[in-house]
């Protein structure tokens, strides 16, 4: 119906997590609901669990409790293994099903020239590398974007 919208929630219940050998949990019985349309930032000192929380959302660690996710998650930074390849080839390796027109749209918004795609990734500056990888992330549809320390 016109005017209606669908609110998708990440529903976290009784989340408890601790690293092996830790004296106390990082998260203890956490309950939280996050609307997937929200744009949120976690601010805190080093070692306070921000990256751990994102990795829990990505199912990188075992935990107690439940995390119900209505959409797939996409995590940044990407893990780049080979810096010597042409940038476009690298992007195809990182996200095989991306659509070039969406990537080009995001590149335009981030003011990245299209010639960047045809240069070896290694020759890009650190800022260019970050921007092209963010453009790839932003080009994904129907995903919750988890961005960890993008600078």
Enumerate the predicted regions with their spans:
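A short, proline-enriched helix->beta-strand linker immediately N-terminal to the Walker B motif
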Residues: 137-144
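Hydrophobic anchor residue at the start of the ABC signature
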Residues: 134
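Catalytic Walker B motif of ABC-type/P-loop ATPase nucleotide-binding domains
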Residues: 145-149
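Interfacial catalytic loop of ABC nucleotide-binding domains
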Residues: 105, 112, 116-120
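ABC ATPase nucleotide-binding domain signature region
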Residues: 36-45, 51-103
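A short, flexible loop at the N-terminus of ABC-type nucleotide-binding domains that lies
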Residues: 3-29, 36, 113
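Conserved ABC ATPase signature
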Residues: 120-124, 128
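Conserved ABC ATPase nucleotide-binding domain "signature" region
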Residues: 51, 128-131
